[in-house]
Amino acid sequence: MNGAQLASKVRNMMKAAQFSRFGGPEVLEIVNLPDPHPGPGQIRIAVHAAGINATEWKLRKGELNFGAGLPQTTGRDVAGVVDEVGEGVTDVAVGDRVFGVSDDGAGAAELALLTFRAPIPPSLGFVDAAALPVALETATRSLDELSVGRGISLLINGTAGGIGSTAVQLAVARGAPVIGTASTANHDYLRLLGAEPVTYGEGMAERVRTLAPDGVDAALDVAGSGVLPELIDLAGGPKNVVTLADFDGAKQHEVRFSSGYQGHAFHALNEIGALIEAGLFWLPVERTYPLDEISEAHRVSEHGHVRGRLVLVIDTRIVKPERGPRG
C-alpha cells in the first residue's frame, strides 16, 4: 500500500470552510467535516491550493442561489494531488498533480472531489494552477459564444481581474485584436497582456471609438457596471454582446447572459498547457492566504480591485506529488 492510499484510509475528518447563515465574510468558519470519497468518474485530491471567485462571495451573501441549503461549503477552483480515484477512472492515478473544479463547491478544504480536471502544466506550481480553472472555462465559453477568432475585434469591459485577464490572452492567442476597460493604474498591465487599454466610466464609449472609429465586432461584459447599452452600440447590436455579470440588464437589453447552463468549456483545462509552456499565457496571483484567513480573502475579493487572482494555500501533508514541481 503506498503512502497516498494509506493516508486515505486512516483519515476520516477534514478541515473545510463553510457558512451556516448568509452575510459578510465573518460568517465563514473552519469546521471538521467527514472525508468525501469519489463516485464513478470522480477523483479525490489532497488540496494544496484553492482559488477565490466572485461566485463564492455572492453565494455567501445570498445573492446567488443554486438550490443548496445551509450550511454550505465554499470553493470551486482547486489544485492538488490525487489520493483516491473512483470507478472507471483511467486518465489519472494516485500521486498525479491535477487542477480543476470542485464538484460540490467544497474546494476550500483539505480534500475535494473532481470530475472536470486536467494535469497541471509542468511549469506551474499548485498556487498558480489553482487560479485558473473557473477563469479558463468562463473565458473560453464566452469567447466561443461570441465566435471570437482571427481578425474579430473584441471589447472587454472589466479586464484586470481573473476572468478578464484570461479572456484577453485567450482572445489574443486566437488572433483577435482586443480593447479592454480598466482603471488607469492597470493600463500598463493590460498592454502586457496584449490589449489596448481604455479607462472605464463616463465617456468610455467615446474613448473606445478613438481606437476603433467603426466600433468592434464583439463585446464581453465581465464587470456588470451598467454599460450594456454602450457595448451594444459599439458592437453593432445585442447579438454581438455577452455579459457574465449583468443578469437583469441582459434581459432588459436582449443580450446573452452566459452562465454555463447552456454548456461548459472544460476542454480549456487540457488546452491551456501549450499556451503556458509557450509563454503566451499568465494569470497573476496577487495574494495568498492560509485557509483560516478565508474571511479576509473574501473581503478583499469582494471589495478590492484585484489584479488577477487570490488563492488559499491549504496546509496539507496528506500526500506528496510523485511528479512535477511542488510550488
Identify the role of each PLM range.
Residues 204-214:
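Short amphipathic alpha-helix with an adjacent loop that forms part of the alpha/beta core around
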